[in-house]
Amino acid sequence: MGFTSAWAVTAHPDDVMADVRPHVLPRIERHRQFPETRRAWRAWCADPLPDHRDWDALRQLPGKHEAITSFLRLTSMIPLDELHCSGDRGVHLYDLWEGADDAVRPYLGFYRKDYAVSALFHAIGPERAALLPGWCGDFALTAEEVRRSLPAVEEALGFTPVERVAAEERIWLDDLPDDEPVLDGPLRCWREAADTGLGLLGVNVHLY
């Protein structure tokens, strides 16, 4: 059965984030603390996966099929889906996306039968991924938290020319010509939000 996922990074003033955070942060933290989630994260950190183009052959080796499946589940399990699917939770994602502050152009990654966060984390590896606030693409940050976290995000998503080529080779997403690359969009949002004094909301959800 097909699906379409979205990873959206949108900017909002602190008064909006104050309303959003009580709905978002507990769900993120609860998911982060699941034993299955922690085991999958530790396994990926201990043994990062090789180039995705080798996965078909790798799946034939003992334990490797499980390692690939574990990583994909880790980066595609979506605790905030209920905020998108239900209108009686005190916050609705479509309303937040439509009401994002115009000072920062949102990053919107829409993919059919795929996940932007999975591809990004595979491209940058666990050491860089661990520098990103929140959990696997989900976060709700005040303006001050955006400013404080910017150096870590710069370290996670900033690349030398050689590093950029290597990261691009590990991205498996099929972008359209007008799509902003997942290697660029989130960092741009962070920089612009830090410059304009806005908070950031990152949400990884299924659209349908």
Q: How would you name each of these model-derived features?
A:
Residues 1-188, 192, 196, 207-208:
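Acidic (Asp/Glu-rich) sequence patches and key acidic residues
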Residues 200-205:
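Short, well-ordered beta-strand elements
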